């Protein structure tokens, strides 16, 4: 994933030092885009090991509409532990906004279901969009949405997806987010009888935390390995019926994991 390495290099070369909410400090650039042709392989970084189990379970959790961290903990996924309340509640974060966006009439909007139906019935629509950025609900969220807005696009029988990530923790978060939305694109494409096209990642505040710079240097020193392939082993009745066991990553070889602190 040369595109990802190029982003880290750009931030190191051109970034400005900024303070941040966590008090850690960052080097940051504003505005960057990466494009991945999903037919070329599944975009998992190979210059450090990614925890695919967490990626899959978190996406399934979002699609369930859940905001209860206990569901993840029961499956051995700890990525939301630092932000969860003692009872596991995370407030109206991604899953709630995706599946139950509150409407003025007191009802709720299932954005994901609407997107799938629009792709099937009106694939040329320019409104195939899901937003997690609900301004009214942000004060009640454990963490404001970083990957805030995504749009699907259909052309030549292929489904593409573009994500806007307003805040991008390049070393820890971005590889995870790329793999998650690439997986979602594969799933939606299967449900809509389409092939996969491109995944486009667009970042706003793209930053490296000051306590990740040694890890970044180590990762940039490593050689790329071939991208793996994603196999989806069955086609469920709906997008909401996938199970963890339905996904197989074939041929994923990577350099060792690089540990880095999470900025909270």
Curated annotation (Swiss-Prot):
Pfam assignment, any one: Thymidylat_synt
Recorded catalytic activity of this chain's protein: dUMP + (6R)-5,10-methylene-5,6,7,8-tetrahydrofolate = 7,8-dihydrofolate + dTMP
Binding site for (6R)-5,10-methylene-5,6,7,8-tetrahydrofolate: 51, 169, 263
InterPro entries per UniProt: Thymidate_synth/dCMP_Mease (IPR045097), Thymidate_synth/dCMP_Mease_dom (IPR023451), Thymidate_synth/dCMP_Mease_sf (IPR036926), Thymidylate_synthase (IPR000398), Thymidylate_synthase_AS (IPR020940)
Keyword tags: Cytoplasm, Methyltransferase, Nucleotide biosynthesis, Transferase
Active site: 146
Known pathway: Pyrimidine metabolism; dTTP biosynthesis
Main location: cytoplasm
Top-level taxonomic group: Bacteria
Binding annotation for dUMP: 21, 126-127, 166-169, 177, 207-209
MF annotations from Gene Ontology: thymidylate synthase activity
Enzyme nomenclature, EC number: 2.1.1.45
Signal peptide: none
Coiled coil region boundaries: none
Listed GO biological process terms: dTMP biosynthetic process; dTTP biosynthetic process; methylation
Compartmental location: Cytoplasm
Gene3D superfamilies for the chain: Thymidylate synthase/dCMP hydroxymethylase domain (3.30.572.10)
GO CC terms: cytosol
PANTHER family in the cross-refs: THYMIDYLATE SYNTHASE (PTHR11548:SF9), THYMIDYLATE SYNTHASE 1 (PTHR11548)
Cited function: Catalyzes the reductive methylation of 2'-deoxyuridine-5'-monophosphate (dUMP) to 2'-deoxythymidine-5'-monophosphate (dTMP) while utilizing 5,10-methylenetetrahydrofolate (mTHF) as the methyl donor and reductant in the reaction, yielding dihydrofolate (DHF) as a by-product. This enzymatic reaction provides an intracellular de novo source of dTMP, an essential precursor for DNA biosynthesis.
Family note: Belongs to the thymidylate synthase family. Bacterial-type ThyA subfamily.
Quaternary organization: Homodimer.
Name of the protein: Thymidylate synthase
Source organism per UniProt: Polynucleobacter asymbioticus (strain DSM 18221 / CIP 109841 / QLW-P1DMWA-1)
């Amino acid at each position: 994933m040369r595109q990802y390495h190029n982003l880290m290099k750009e931030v190191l070369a051109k970034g400005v030092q900024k303070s941040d909410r966590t008090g850690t400090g960052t080097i940051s650039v504003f505005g960057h885009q990466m494009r991945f042709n999903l037919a070329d392989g599944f975009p998992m970084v190979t210059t450090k090991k990614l925890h695919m189990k967490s990626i899959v379970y978190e996406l399934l959790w979002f699609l369930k509409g859940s905001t209860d961290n206990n569901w993840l903990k029961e499956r051995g996924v700890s990525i939301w532990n630092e932000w969860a309340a003692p009872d596991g509640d995370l407030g109206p974060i991604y899953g709630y906004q995706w599946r139950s966006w509150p409407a003025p009439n007191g009802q709720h909007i299932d954005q994901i279901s609407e997107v799938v139906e629009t792709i099937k019935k009106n694939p040329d629509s320019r409104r195939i969009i899901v937003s997690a950025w609900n301004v009214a609900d942000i004060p009640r969220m454990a963490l404001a949405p970083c990957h805030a807005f995504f749009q699907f696009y259909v052309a030549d029988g292929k489904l593409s997806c573009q994500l806007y990530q307003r805040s991008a923790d390049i070393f820890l978060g971005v590889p995870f987010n790329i793999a998650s939305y690439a997986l979602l694109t594969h799933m939606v494409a299967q449900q809509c009888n389409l092939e996969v096209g491109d995944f486009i990642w667009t970042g706003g505040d793209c930053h490296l935390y000051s306590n990740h710079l040694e890890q970044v240097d180590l990762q940039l020193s490593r050689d790329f390995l071939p991208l793996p392939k994603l196999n989806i082993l069955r086609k469920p009745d709906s997008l909401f019926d996938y199970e963890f066991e339905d996904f197989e990553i074939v041929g994923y070889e990577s350099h060792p994991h690089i540990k880095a602190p999470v900025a909270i």
